[in-house]
Amino acid sequence: MNRVFKSGFVTIIGRPNVGKSTLMNQLIGQKIAITSSKAQTTRNRIQTVYTSEEGQIVFLDTPGINKAKNKLGDYMLMAAERTLNEVDLILWLVEPTTFIGGGEQYIIEKLQNVKTPIFLVINKTDIASEEEVLKAIVAYKDQCNFAEIIPVSALEGNNTDDLVHSIFNYLPEGPMYYDEDTITDQPERQIVAELVREKALRLLSQEIPHGIAVVIERMKNRKGRDIVCLLYTSDAADEGLGV
């Protein structure tokens, strides 16, 4: 008897800095999406691919969903919202130590008219008590019609195997969209550029805003490869801060 192969698209949403990129990196076992303490570190919709004998999951890591404050924020918000009705499953990440405030209510409003199944994924259980996790479950469970509520630690990988198994339960039978060795649709230069941007955001901390872009000028494929890149900021006054 042939095993049923399942496949589908899963988007990861949530307020900025709840661990969306960390979870995606953990699930595929490799660093693709960058992480930072700054809001909206993820600029574009990034696709990563998890493949096993059970099937294939294409994860979409989107910018954090929150009210936009500028044109860049508008674009990032539209990119996040556009995925909600285009996928087979939504993972909404929340923190157990954060109360349901305006940001969470904003996401709840966006999810009200969505027909896609939604998992509530309570992240950062490694730094929260069992009581805090239980309180979060009670607080959130009636906010949406959740298909599943699953506590995890994206950083340490706790309960992520159960999360993957539950995801496959909600995916349809389907084809393998990518070959089994593919883990992302991002070109190598884009991954390198994002890793450089991550370092810039961390090392320069408050000096440079998240309105920073990295362009790879040259990258040679050799041992001890040479990479030449340019950093652009949204404010000319920031240029000297990175020197």
Give the positions of each predicted feature.
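Switch II of P-loop NTPase G domains
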Residues: 40-45, 63-86, 97-109
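Conserved G1/Walker A P-loop phosphate-binding module
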Residues: 2-67
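Conserved nucleotide-binding/hydrolysis micro-motifs of P-loop NTPases
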Residues: 39-41, 63-66, 96-100, 125-128, ...
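C-terminal end of P-loop GTPase domains and the immediately downstream helical coupling element
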Residues: 159-221
